């Protein structure tokens, strides 16, 4: 499932942020000192997000297993969603001696030498973890022939989906069986607009980009894509792909018809999944989400999903949640042992992600690896699954059907790798040109992508401005040159 905080962080992390050392205040975590652990090393981990209220209890339970298996203790310090990129930038540049962190701006910091090379550690301390990883994770996280990340195994492939509010579907008797694209979405938006005028038909925000079967060699702020339905040996501009332009025309029709909020290009309004203020939205769904089960559980109501892109393994899906070991860590081997354990030991991982057994959850008798959540399971009494450890050793909630489990296995087995998986664009020769393109894109991108302006008028204006500056052709040619070399070396 697309977690709004997760993806907001991922988007923000592409921007280099500068801040003073004071920005590293307000760390939240376990305050016990290394002296409390005797001579066992305390491994310090930085994690993104809000600290669970019962973090001390979660870590106490976890450390019983970690001490026995690894001979070390884990200390987790949380940095807030909005602060993480800025604070980790300061921590990294200051050379602080931490051990493990949720990766921020992974490729850039790996290239800078901020992270430890884990290639050899994977052969010994991380060998069990390595065996459990889909090979796509290694391909997508290899930088200049070396691997610096311990990825959280989850949705190595994912698709974009329309997620419909099941309460409103049932209340107004709306049939979504024919919805497969933006173009076929229009009739149901018309129905909800007429039947429930106070509901936002298509709930999108200013960071919205229409979904398609594209792979982005660089951040979405630039228009360059590999068209997975076209010539996959070429880098192209998404605004010059005919079907993408049709999506934009359709979105403009939605905007003019009032299906999209009028202030979408400027508003920070979010739409709570649990409320009935919206009819349909977009969500990223992967095999580890078991169809609509996770969305429905989080929303506390039925959510119906309709896929609009294919399940593809891309760099983006392999880098959603990476852990790294600091190059300055004095405990690299122990750190890797803990990450290995976290991703291979079900008792350890489930105790963190579900919380304390008996309070937060209980096993269902006669059903292997199935659990029922209890009253103690709340948002602030456990850690997140997507950014903690291997989702495939997590117990499965009772609301997941056997058919959903089988479907997930099938999706995972059939998911294809993007031809660009593992391609990392070296921007050293075109940094100023990329900045120039990004500045131009900021003038047009949001209005075009949200349907606010007529794409037949705005896209030619954008392309004329891009091509008049010289930077556009230089970056495109450099990217194509590097991509050609990448494809040549793959053969």
UniProtKB/Swiss-Prot annotation:
Localization, UniProt: Cell surface
GO biological process terms on file: carbohydrate import across plasma membrane; protein homotetramerization; protein homotrimerization
Pfam assignment, any one: SBP_bac_8
Gene Ontology terms, MF aspect: protein homodimerization activity; zinc ion binding
Cited InterPro entries: Bact_solute-bd_prot1, DUF3502, SBP
Entry GO terms, CC: ATP-binding cassette (ABC) transporter complex, substrate-binding subunit-containing; external side of cell wall
Keywords assigned by UniProt, alphabetized: Metal-binding, Sugar transport, Transport, Zinc
Keyword check for Zinc-finger: no
Transcription regulation as UniProt keyword: no
SUPFAM superfamilies attached to this UniProt entry: Periplasmic binding protein-like II (SSF53850)
Biotech uses: This protein has potential use in the development of vaccines and antimicrobials against pneumococcus, because of its extracellular localization and the essentiality of carbohydrate import for the pneumococcal metabolism. The characterization protocol developed for this protein can be helpful in structure-based design of inhibitors for the carbohydrate-binding proteins in general.
Residues noted as binding Zn(2+) in the record, renumbered to the chain: 212, 247, 252, 256
Assembly description: Exists as a monomer, homodimer, homotrimer and homotetramer; oligomerization increases with higher protein concentration.
Function per UniProt: Probably part of an ABC transporter complex involved in carbohydrate transport.
Family: Belongs to the bacterial solute-binding protein 1 family.
Protein name, entry field: Carbohydrate ABC transporter substrate-binding protein
Origin organism lineage: Bacteria, Bacillati, Bacillota, Bacilli, Lactobacillales
């Amino acid at each position: 499932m697309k977690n709004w905080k997760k993806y907001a962080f991922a988007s923000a992390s592409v921007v280099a942020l500068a801040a003073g050392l004071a920005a590293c205040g307000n760390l939240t975590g376990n305050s016990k000192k290394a002296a409390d652990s005797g001579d066992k090393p305390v491994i310090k981990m930085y994690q993104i997000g809000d600290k669970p209220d019962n973090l001390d209890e979660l870590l106490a339970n976890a450390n019983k297993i970690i001490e026995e298996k690894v001979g070390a203790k884990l200390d987790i310090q949380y940095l807030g969603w909005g602060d993480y990129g800025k604070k980790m930038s300061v921590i990294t540049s200051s050379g602080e001696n931490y051990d493990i962190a949720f990766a921020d701006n992974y490729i850039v910091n790996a290239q800078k030498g901020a992270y430890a090379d884990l290639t050899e550690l994977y052969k010994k301390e991380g060998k069990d973890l390595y065996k459990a990883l889909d090979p796509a994770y290694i391909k997508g996280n290899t930088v200049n022939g070396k691997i610096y990340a311990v990825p959280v195994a989850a949705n190595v492939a994912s698709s974009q989906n329309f997620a419909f509010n099941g309460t409103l579907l049932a209340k107004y008797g709306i049939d979504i069986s024919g919805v497969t694209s933006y173009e076929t979405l229009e009739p149901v938006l018309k129905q909800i607009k007429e039947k429930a005028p106070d509901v936002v038909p298509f709930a999108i925000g200013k960071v919205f980009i229409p979904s398609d079967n594209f792979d982005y060699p660089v951040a979405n702020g630039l228009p360059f894509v590999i068209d997975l339905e076209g010539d996959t040996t070429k880098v192209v501009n998404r605004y010059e792909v005919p079907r993408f332009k049709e999506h934009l025309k359709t979105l403009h029709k939605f905007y003019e018809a009032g299906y999209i909020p009028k202030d979408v290009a400027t508003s920070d309004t979010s739409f709570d999944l649990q409320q009935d203020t919206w009819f349909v939205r977009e969500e990223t769904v992967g095999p580890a989400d078991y169809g609509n089960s996770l969305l429905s559980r989080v929303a506390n109501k039925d959510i119906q999903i309709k896929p609009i892109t294919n399940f593809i393994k891309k760099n983006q899906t392999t880098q959603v949640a990476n852990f790294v070991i600091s190059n300055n860590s004095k405990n690299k081997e122990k750190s890797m042992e803990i990450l290995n354990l976290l991703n291979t030991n079900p008792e350890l991982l489930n105790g963190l992600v579900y919380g304390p057994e008996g309070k937060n959850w209980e096993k269902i008798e006669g059903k292997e690896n199935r659990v029922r959540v209890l009253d103690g399971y709340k948002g602030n009494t456990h850690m997140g699954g997507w950014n903690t450890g291997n989702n495939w050793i997590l117990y499965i909630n009772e609301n997941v059907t056997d058919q959903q489990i089988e479907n997930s296995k099938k999706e995972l087995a059939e998911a294809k790798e993007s031809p660009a998986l593992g391609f990392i664009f070296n921007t050293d020769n075109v940094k100023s040109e990329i900045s120039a393109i990004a500045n131009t894109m900021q003038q047009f991108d949001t209005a075009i992508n949200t349907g606010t302006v007529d794409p037949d008028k705005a896209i030619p204006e954008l392309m004329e401005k891009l091509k008049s500056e010289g930077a556009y052709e230089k970056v495109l040619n450099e990217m194509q040159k590097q991509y050609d070399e990448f494809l040549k070396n793959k053969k």
